[in-house]
Amino acid sequence: MTKRYWNIILEEMMEAGVHFGHGTRKWNPKMSPYISAKRKGIHITNLIRTARFLSEACDLVFDAASEGKQFLIVGTKKKAADSVARAAIRARCHYVNKKWLGGMLTNWYTTETRLQKFRDLRMQQKTGRLNSFPKRDAAILKRHLAHLETYLGGIKYMTGLPDIVIIVDQQEEYTALRECITLEIPTICLIDTNCDPDLADISIPANDDAIASIRLILNKLVFAICEGRSSYIRNS
């Protein structure tokens, strides 16, 4: 993996509050190497380590994107949802930002069946065919379509398992992370001071509660993905 420069600036991370961890009582001792201080009952993340692992993650996603690999970004809590959708759309990645449906990856056949149903209903809506059904049936199908749009809208173009999964909050998305581990799908995970750094392939120590922090980390990763995609197109 070639090392590149990703313009990761410590002052910028400090302004975004990337260094603020959880309260000192809510911490995982495994995070000790990534913590630089305690301040007013809060752990402070070592931003030098954050910059290092974020840079490694950017190198990884650049290389993967330059080979045409597919990405899935997962972040379902309210503070992360909008940033996840925007970042994924910008980099043409798949995303889940509402609710992780158990077995979404490990039971891919069921997910694929749901996606096919979703595509069929969308096509029927586009062509106006839904309106040809009896009123009650049409209403049921439209509700079902809205439900599928909410939970599967971000993966509607996904035709197989992703090559790399980016996870915004390890604890919130633990089910998704476990599925990736089971399937041996490489993961990049934002980890706060209450997380286990050993679970993901690349763990980025960062504040996973502040919108500005989440957005900054995602923007760096997405920029690297976009650069990799451009390289892939040039070399195709």
UniProtKB/Swiss-Prot annotation:
GO terms classed as biological process: translation
Asked if the record carries the keyword Chloroplast, the reply is: yes
The Gene Ontology terms for molecular function here are: structural constituent of ribosome
This entry carries the following GO cellular component terms, namely: chloroplast; mitochondrial small ribosomal subunit
**What's the short name of a Pfam family annotated to this entry?**
Ribosomal_S2
Q: Which family does it belong to?
A: Belongs to the universal ribosomal protein uS2 family.
Protein name, please?
A: Small ribosomal subunit protein uS2c
| Provenance organism | Glycine max
